[in-house]
Curated annotation (Swiss-Prot):
Catalytic function, reaction form: chlorophyllide a + oxidized 2[4Fe-4S]-[ferredoxin] + 2 ADP + 2 phosphate = protochlorophyllide a + reduced 2[4Fe-4S]-[ferredoxin] + 2 ATP + 2 H2O
Function description: Component of the dark-operative protochlorophyllide reductase (DPOR) that uses Mg-ATP and reduced ferredoxin to reduce ring D of protochlorophyllide (Pchlide) to form chlorophyllide a (Chlide). This reaction is light-independent. The NB-protein (ChlN-ChlB) is the catalytic component of the complex.
Pathway this chain belongs to: Porphyrin-containing compound metabolism; chlorophyll biosynthesis (light-independent)
Protein name: Light-independent protochlorophyllide reductase subunit B
Active site feature: 294 (proton donor)
Species for this entry: Trichormus variabilis (strain ATCC 29413 / PCC 7937)
Biological process, per Gene Ontology: light-independent chlorophyll biosynthetic process; photosynthesis, dark reaction
Keywords on record: 4Fe-4S, ATP-binding, Chlorophyll biosynthesis, Iron, Iron-sulfur, Metal-binding, Nucleotide-binding, Oxidoreductase, Photosynthesis
Length: 508
């Protein structure tokens, strides 16, 4: 176990709660100490949800430690069942309940005797999986539970829908731009003449889950949530699964062609080539923009990418393949699925990083000095310290990346949003230099601290004055080169003379 003050993917119970609270009329009960119950605040603040977060904490306190938990947990489940009348109550274990070795399965069986709704124990091992894996497992567990229940009662619908239809699997609360992506995917499916059979878990009722096998295919837009459910439906009912992420012009077209292949194999007769062509040329501005002089100015510029598998892989491909930007390294914090990530991005970047250590990522950014960073909220903090612009492309994110306006990342409108994000993330030409020449609130003192908190060097007054004269868009690079030169030569104080010597040494 490792003590961390920053985690890219949260603990397992957060994933379970994200899935449970995405469904309509499902209540979650978390068996945890106070301190693990921050999910309620996080959901209402970040997602700006209007409804009350349906999560109750069954607090592990000194009385529980003395007498055991059964009485308290069972009482909480039956009380919430009577008060809220949920269709399903999910009991979520936590690290604490695992340490105490509580028999939660027994608690659920006991509570089920009195509860009118269904009660389910989330089957996740807190010490083996993180938020993303737990969310995937919980969604699969809930879907399987209700399909098996319908099968036992003989209520499972026969056959497929009359028209081609799709289940969109993996849209959840607190997901990165999930609601906007869902709207865009529905619009895309309508354009293709495909009905949406279900969207899960966001906004779905557990009673609708028995209808999932009626769809012609399942679309899983995010690799982190939904693959287990889709493979279960494929194994049980033969429903094909499409897991191509429709992000960027090339991948969106590839996804649509795969949809065409899948539904034509089931008796449809569609050809989407004309639609793809029209969208690429006229609706999405990304293809046109990539040929414009603005985009050509970005050709060869250095960038780094870090995030979850889905977004980091997609952005790496878009930057390299569609916009001609040099991706120095691409990374992911999804260590459990590292092989897939390597396979996807290795030909589009110089180096692949697989790590959950934000310090390692910060140092890697400082080492390569990119023109722009594309990452999570943490990489934005790193970018601010190093004075490198950052576009946020993946969770974890703060409230400003839950936009109120329509900003999908998927589909053809998503390509426009991503293109804007990429272009606006790079510092334009002489912008910094001009601001410094003409003054204004944007002028700023030189920040002499690097990514590492401890620094063995100090700048003298004349050294700083000389550094201030250097244009802003190259100042950071000059500063880092000078500090490297000073360390190599054993200087402790950097004066103007040391700066001149460093410039001569690198031929500047």
């Amino acid at each position: 176990m490792k003590l961390a003050y920053w985690m890219y993917a949260g603990p397992a119970h957060i994933g379970t709660l994200r899935v449970a609270t995405s469904f309509k009329n499902v209540h979650a009960i978390m068996h945890a100490p106070l301190g693990d119950d921050y999910f309620n605040v996080m959901r209402s603040m970040l997602s700006r949800e209007r409804d009350f977060t349906p999560v109750t904490t069954s607090v592990v306190d000194r009385h529980v430690l003395a007498r055991g938990s059964q009485e308290k947990v069972v009482e909480n489940i039956t009380r919430k069942d009577a008060e809220e009348h949920p269709d399903l109550i999910v009991l979520t274990p936590t690290c604490t309940s695992s340490i105490l070795q509580e028999d939660l399965e027994n608690f659920v069986e006991r509570a089920q005797l009195d509860a009118k709704g269904d009660v389910l124990l989330a089957d996740v091992n807190h010490y083996r999986v993180n938020e993303l894996q737990a969310g995937d497992r919980t969604l699969h567990q809930i879907v399987q539970y209700y399909i098996e229940k319908a099968r036992k009662k003989g209520e499972l619908p026969e056959g497929k829908t009359a028209k081609p239809s799709v289940n969109i699997i993996g849209i959840s609360t607190l997901g990165f731009h999930n609601n906007h992506d869902c709207t865009e995917l529905k619009r895309l499916m309508a354009d293709l003449g495909i009905e949406v059979n279900a969207v899960i878990p966001e906004g779905a009722s557990v009673h609708e889950l028995k209808n999932l096998p009626r769809a012609w295919f399942n679309l899983v837009p995010y690799r982190e949530l939904g693959l287990m459910t889709a493979s279960y439906l494929e194994k049980e009912f033969g429903t094909p699964c499409i897991d191509i992420v429709p992000m960027g012009v090339v991948e969106t077209a590839r996804c649509i062609r795969k949809i065409q292949e899948v539904i034509n194999a089931q008796g449809a007769d569609v050809n989407y080539e004309e639609y793809i062509n029209e969208q690429t040329l006229y609706v999405s501005q990304a293809a046109w923009f990539s040929r414009s002089i603005d985009c050509q100015n970005l050709t060869g510029k250095k960038a780094v990418v870090f995030g979850d598998n889905t977004h980091a892989a997609a952005l790496t491909k878009i930057l390299s393949r569609e916009m001609g930007i040099h991706v120095v390294w691409a990374g992911t914090y999804c260590k459990y699925d590292a092989d897939w990530f390597r396979e996807q991005v290795s030909e589009y970047c110089d180096e692949v990083l697989i790590t959950e250590d934000h310090g390692e990522i910060g140092d890697a950014i400082a080492r390569v000095e990119p023109s722009a960073i594309f990452g999570t909220q943490m990489e934005r903090h790193v970018g601010k310290r190093l004075d490198i612009p950052c576009g946020v492309i993946a969770a974890p994110i703060h409230v400003q990346n839950f936009p109120i306006g329509y900003k999908p990342f998927l589909g053809y409108e998503g390509t426009n949003q991503i293109t804007d994000l990429i272009y606006n993330s790079f510092t334009l030409g002489m912008e910094d230099h001009l601001l410094e020449i003409f003054g204004g609130h944007d002028t700023k003192e030189v920040i002499t601290k690097g990514i590492s908190a401890e620094s063995d060097l100090s700048w003298t007054k004349d050294g700083l004055a000389e550094l201030n004269k250097i244009p802003g868009f190259v100042r950071g690079k000059v500063k880092r080169n000078t500090e490297k030169f000073a360390r190599d030569r054993g200087f402790k104080d950097i004066s103007a003379e040391v700066l001149y010597a460093a410039k001569e040494a690198v031929g500047a």
